Amino acid sequence: MSAFENFGVRQDVTDVTRLECGICWTVYDPADGDDVAQIAPGTPFAALPEEWHCPNCDAPKSKFMAIES
């Protein structure tokens, strides 16, 4: 078994999971949404449009990691 097995595979990401940008550490919290991109509160990360990016550093969605509450 490699230390990198399943690296980058998102598991256990629910509609309320908070995710953090791996570049600038900005947190996307579904409860808050994203005022900059006009994303309504209550919008889960999976429902964000593909073109959505970090409001702080412009990193793509793929750079976000699930964090524990």
UniProtKB/Swiss-Prot annotation:
The gene is hupI. Could be an electron transport intermediate in hydrogen oxidation. Residues 16-67 form the Rubredoxin-like domain. Keywords: Electron transport, Iron, Metal-binding, Transport. This is Probable rubredoxin HupI. The keyword Metal-binding applies. Gene3D superfamilies: 2.20.28.10. Its cofactor is Fe(3+). Binds 1 Fe(3+) ion per subunit. Transmembrane segments: none annotated.
